Design a protein with these regions (language model features):
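A polyanion-binding, active-site-adjacent surface
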Residues: 29-212, 222, 227, 232
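Alpha-helix/helix-capping structural signal
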Residues: 218-219
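Short, flexible loop segments at boundaries between secondary-structure elements
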Residues: 229-255
Length: 257
């Protein structure tokens, strides 16, 4: 009887230690994400929109939009902490994607459940909170849709990866737009702007150590090369590159355990 009681005490102590360690890890990770969100506040000046800390006065539904986008991003990142095997780095946020969703290469329509026919569900992105659209209804009644987002998410899911095993981000984390065309436009970030985003990219990669990093296109490849990290370059799916992207990402995924 005494031996049994001692064994139970040892087991209970071991469980308590593991639980405490897991709670500490979760707290540290959460602190890391919150610190990362604060870093994102420091966006460069000029024709750059910061969706997590700025209001798009012409196109946001209301002034709560930045806070909603921060919640979206926080939930998305927390879902993937400790389980990511693949990091995919794009160029910059687009006005049809992260500008309103708050998540790179992810459209409002994905979050609102309007891409289920493409095999993409809102819970693939996050499930801890309910998604909320931040754009007003005038421009796109069903929310904005981004072709790159649909192609990237759809391809990775069809290749059999669990959504928490991959995380999407951008070399330039904010939305660079054409000042003559307004917020609802995209442009390539300048070299000076890309340099301003380097710290955020480095912090992001430290948050999500993984087996493979994929660069979508030349801008992402250039930034990753500057950080001296190993990566696989694949064709960006935009501008007619979808077919080649699917072929190349399939090869990368086949090599991933």
């Amino acid at each position: 009887m005494q031996t049994s009681l001692s064994a139970n005490r040892i087991l209970a102590g071991a469980i308590a230690c593991v639980t405490s360690a897991l709670n500490l890890f979760a707290t540290m990770c959460s602190d890391g994400i919150d610190d990362f969100l604060r870093r994102l506040k420091e966006s460069p000046p000029g024709a750059v929109f910061n969706p997590w800390w700025q209001v798009d006065k012409e196109n946001d539904a209301d002034r709560n939009a930045p806070a909603i986008r921060r919640r979206h991003l926080r939930a998305y990142l927390r879902k993937r902490l400790g389980s990511v095997k693949l990091v995919v780095i794009g160029e910059a946020l687009g006005y049809r994607g992260g500008h309103f969703s708050g998540i790179p290469m992810t459209s409002e329509r994905i979050l609102l459940g309007k891409k289920k026919n493409d095999g993409i569900k809102p819970e693939h992105v996050f499930s801890s909170i309910k998604a909320t659209r931040t754009s007003n209804c005038e421009e796109c009644p069903d929310g904005f849709s981004e072709p790159t987002a649909t192609i990237v998410w759809g391809s990775l899911l069809r290749l059999g990866r669990e959504p928490q095993e991959f995380v999407l981000w951008n070399a330039f984390p904010w939305h660079s737009f054409n000042p003559r065309r307004g917020m609802l436009s995209n442009r390539m970030p300048t070299q000076k702007e890309r340099s301003a985003g380097m710290s955020a990219l480095k912090t992001f990669l430290n948050l999500f150590p993984c087996d493979k990093i994929v660069a979508l296109g030349n801008v992402a490849a250039s930034q990753l090369k500057e950080l001296n990290v190993e990566f696989h370059r694949v064709r960006h799916p935009a501008s007619g590159g979808a077919k080649l992207f699917r072929q190349q990402i399939k090869k990368v995924m086949n090599d991933l355990c």
